[in-house]
Amino acid sequence: MSLKSSAKVALSLMDLTTLNDNATDEKVIALCQQGNTEFGTPAAVCVYPRFVPVARKALKAQQTEQVKIATVTNFPHGNDDIDIAVTETKAAIAYGADEVDVVFPYKALMAGNEQVGFELVKQCKAVCQASGVLLKVIIETGELKTPALIRKASELAIQAGADFIKTSTGKVAINATLESARIMLETIRDLNVAEKVGFKAAGGVKTTEEAEQYLALAKTILGEDWVNSAHFRFGASSLLNNLLATLNDQTAQVVTGY
């Protein structure tokens, strides 16, 4: 696949994201407008829950209503209070989110508690399922660090009903890496759930070349046909400009950011 082809595919798999603490209505509207490119639209935009209605209105105004709206809960710290995570998830759905990215209680898992993570995901999944909302579970691979913990968090999230497993919040020192992606993709393969569980690489994927490496990895482990927006996403913001530069034959400017 040519770099241009990869860029076009990657664009269609993006969850175009703004999760900065200084986010405003204007910035969310601008994000939605950025995603309306001559090469197509991203799979979703990802914003804080309170901005979901703003994004909905902006997407409708530019006639790109096919773009899903994702949001985050139990974010970014992945606390182990199940009630709070469920309450936040219910609120996100009430705001009108199509997809919820919930943070797995990874610190509890690191301390040896597997049950709370399973139960938290299970209860959030029940709430999402009742409303036809997709649940992505952020396991925070850069904090889990070890292959054993990354695999265990992936397994627990999947067994509890995750529709996607996602690498990172983008709020810690180490976000998506090819190593952690490989473990997560292999877990999806090994549990025989590729038809119903997807993968999202978030934070740290900034260039077309980097995106292409993740696409190639997913295809190697789960097959060419698996890589589509129902199964694979990139959580990113600065990646978009680099994909567009590739598609427009311009020299990419690496932009800092998620």
UniProtKB/Swiss-Prot annotation:
Cell location: Cytoplasm
Pathway: Carbohydrate degradation; 2-deoxy-D-ribose 1-phosphate degradation; D-glyceraldehyde 3-phosphate and acetaldehyde from 2-deoxy-alpha-D-ribose 1-phosphate: step 2/2
Domain of life: Bacteria
GO MF annotations in UniProt: deoxyribose-phosphate aldolase activity
SMART domains, A to Z: DeoC
A family per Pfam: DeoC
Enzyme class: lyase
Residues at the active site: 101, 166, 200
Its EC number(s): 4.1.2.4
Listed InterPro entries: Aldolase_TIM, DeoC, DeoC/FbaB/LacD_aldolase, DeoC_typeII
Catalytic activity of the protein: 2-deoxy-D-ribose 5-phosphate = D-glyceraldehyde 3-phosphate + acetaldehyde
CC per GO annotation: cytoplasm
Main localization of the protein described in the UniProt heading: cytoplasm
GO biological process, one term: carbohydrate catabolic process
Keywords on record: Cytoplasm, Lyase, Schiff base
Family note: Belongs to the DeoC/FbaB aldolase family. DeoC type 2 subfamily.
Function of the protein: Catalyzes a reversible aldol reaction between acetaldehyde and D-glyceraldehyde 3-phosphate to generate 2-deoxy-D-ribose 5-phosphate.
Protein name: Deoxyribose-phosphate aldolase
Organism: Haemophilus ducreyi (strain 35000HP / ATCC 700724)
Upper taxonomic lineage: Bacteria, Pseudomonadati, Pseudomonadota, Gammaproteobacteria, Pasteurellales
